[in-house]
Amino acid sequence: IEDVPNLLKNLKTIMQPDSLLIMNFLGGKTLSELQKQLIDLEIKFYGGASPRIMPFIDIKSAGMLIQNAGFRMPIIDSENINITHSNLLDLFHDLRGMGQTNCMSSVSIPLRKKITTLLEKKLTNKNKINTTFELITVTAWNN
C-alpha cells in the first residue's frame, strides 16, 4: 500500500462509530538483514542500489499515522519473528508467496547471478539463512 494515510482515513470513514480497529502489518525491522546486504552489494558492483524491498513503517510512525487519521486510544505493539530458510531461493519463494516481491512501482535492475551468489554467502550462517519479520499490531478506537 503506497498511501497509508489515505487508507487509514478511508477505514475510519467506513467504520461504525465507537468501533475497534485491529490491524497487523510488517514493520521497519522486517528483512533488515537482506536489505542491508543487498544495498551493500549493489553499491559495490553497480555504484548504486535499486529499491528491491518495500519500505516498511516503523512502530513510532505507525502511532503517528493512526493518531493523524483521527483514531483514539491507540495501542501499538511489535514482535520480531525470526524465520530460517535453507537457501536464498526458498526465501525468495516465500517472499513471492507473501506478495512481497516486485511490489515497488519503480523499476529496478534485475538481480544478477553474481549478486545473488554473494548475497547467499553473506546471509548464510551454519547452512541456514535467518531473516527477521517485525509484526506490528495496532488497536485503536474510531470515535
Give the positions of each predicted feature.
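Catalytic P-loop NTPase motifs of RecA-like helicase/translocase cores
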Residues: 1-2, 29
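A short glycine-rich, Lys/Arg-flanked "PGG" loop and its adjoining helix->strand segment in the class I
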Residues: 5-20
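Short, glycine/charged-enriched secondary-structure capping and boundary segments
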Residues: 6-9, 36-39, 89-90
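Conserved catalytic/acceptor-binding region of the Class I
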Residues: 18, 22-86, 102-105
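Conserved Class I S-adenosyl-L-methionine
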Residues: 75-143
